[in-house]
Amino acid sequence: MAKSAYQILRKPVITEKGLGVKETESTLVFEVSANATKTEIKEAVQKTFKVKVDTVRTANFVGKERRRGKFSGYRPDWKKAYVRLKTGEKMPEYAENL
């Protein structure tokens, strides 16, 4: 069963580094589904924002241990995707307002 674009793209990651690469490299940063592939991420961004994608880079993050008194647990593992747009492509409207 194919996943929808909204199941693959969880939310944009808005950090200083993310805003920096947005300006200099025309790259968008997203938190994505942990089992999403680069081609699925590329197709989801192209379908959702109607832009052409050049490359996709991903990074996996292991959840950190968190404690509440004597109880301990772990944050969930997650994946981040850096999506570079092709030259000449306009940034999506949500990214221009950041």
From Swiss-Prot:
In its UniProt record, which GO terms are filed under biological process? Answer: translation
* Keywords (A to Z) from UniProt: Ribonucleoprotein, Ribosomal protein, RNA-binding, rRNA-binding
Homology family: Belongs to the universal ribosomal protein uL23 family.
Quaternary context: Part of the 50S ribosomal subunit. Contacts protein L29, and trigger factor when it is bound to the ribosome.
Q: Does Iron appear among the keywords?
A: no
Q: State a GO cellular component annotated for this protein.
A: ribonucleoprotein complex
Keyword Ribonucleoprotein applies: yes
Annotated S-S bridges: none
Q: Which residues cross the membrane?
A: none
Official protein name in the record: Large ribosomal subunit protein uL23
User: What Gene3D superfamilies does the record point to?
Assistant: 3.30.70.330
| Gene coding for it | rplW
Functional summary from the UniProt entry: One of the early assembly proteins it binds 23S rRNA. One of the proteins that surrounds the polypeptide exit tunnel on the outside of the ribosome. Forms the main docking site for trigger factor binding to the ribosome.
In which organism is this protein found?
Koribacter versatilis (strain Ellin345)
- Kindly list the organism's lineage: Bacteria, Pseudomonadati, Acidobacteriota, Terriglobia, Terriglobales
Q: Which InterPro entries match?
A: Nucleotide-bd_a/b_plait_sf (IPR012677), Ribosomal_uL23-like (IPR013025), Ribosomal_uL23/eL15/eS24_sf (IPR012678)
Recorded hits in Pfam families, A to Z, give: Ribosomal_L23
- Single GO term (MF): rRNA binding
